[in-house]
Amino acid sequence: MSFFQLDSTPAPRALAAMCGGAVLALAACMGAQATVYNPPIQLSNGIEYMSGGIGSDEAELMRTVEPRWPAVFEFAVKDGRKADFAADVTLTVRDAQGRMVLDHVRASGPYLVARLEPGKYSAEAMLSGQVLQREVTVGGPGTSSRNVFEWPQGTNMQSASSS
């Protein structure tokens, strides 16, 4: 047998097929792992915002990006001694002159981050018809204003029981 001639016996071919199969199986397993993507950045009156946080991976991602956004809103419903995350919240934010900067935007998860300019704002969040209001102050570059809206226990159930 020449130095450059391949052995054509079945054993090396079977071994190569098994190795190839193992590589493909490993690639399939790696591809099956959950990949978390940033929720889409959206616009309201020229203001960028992003909402999400459904599921532990996406919630962790939102907590990771929070420091890069000047305004952070978190939505929850009181549940005894703790609070559960709330989703499907409608948020409206007005600047100090009363102009709407976020116009009835829907938070698809318990977190919403927005690129608001430094200043004072009035924020109104609605869940199941119940409205909470907060005064919000956004600081200068490199700071993040965290604003938590927490509804009373059973708020989400009001809309579920009325249908």
Feature map (PLM): residue ranges:
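Bacterial N-terminal signal peptides
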Residues: 17-27
